[in-house]
Amino acid sequence: MLQPKQTNWVILAGGQARRMGGQDKGFVTFQDKPLIEHALDTLRSQTDHIAINANRSIDNYSRYTVTFKDEFTDYPGPLAGMHAGLVNMASDWVGFIPCDSPNLPNNLISLLCNAVKDDTDIVVAHDGEYMQPVVTLMHKRIIPKIDAFLARGDRKIILLYKECNTVFADFSDYPNAFINLNSPQELEQFGTLL
């Protein structure tokens, strides 16, 4: 069975944040601290192996932990950050969370690791109703598949998951875990719920 200590983790903070008015979402304040700090707190309670993927504010993110850009200039979405994480991190298994989900559970890593089987390429969190495509754990052996996927212009992570041996980790006991804060309205709406 895959152990959490055998994994490295990347916080995805490389998006354009259009719905947030172009603000760097990692530095948007939620409950008195930047969203990036919520993500770091979640992971630090479970692992020491954390990096950030960002395409701007690199110096600011680097104050927290190792930070790297992805190699794509056209913002192909979270898959670019996942590719960068798989290439840059040392372990065979690399996990990913978004910077804008401040309510992820403190047993996230163990739940994802427990779902891994011998032939698993990717584990994706599932809340009982929907898959959560950017809360995931991936094996480095899929790098060539991501390369080919992006080279042909595909961007939808779910399509990549169909090309790989993907399994789901059950997070149905955590109904509010995957609230994603994409806009000022969502910050206000969920600020009192979480």
Swiss-Prot record:
| Compartments it resides in | Cytoplasm
Which residues bind GTP per the record? 12-14, 25, 53, 70, 100
Q: What is this protein called?
A: Molybdenum cofactor guanylyltransferase
Functional note: Transfers a GMP moiety from GTP to Mo-molybdopterin (Mo-MPT) cofactor (Moco or molybdenum cofactor) to form Mo-molybdopterin guanine dinucleotide (Mo-MGD) cofactor.
Keyword match Transferase: yes
Spell out the reaction equation it catalyses. Answer: Mo-molybdopterin + GTP + H(+) = Mo-molybdopterin guanine dinucleotide + diphosphate
**Would you say which domain of life the source belongs to?**
Bacteria
Q: One biological process GO term for this chain? A: bis(molybdopterin guanine dinucleotide)molybdenum biosynthetic process
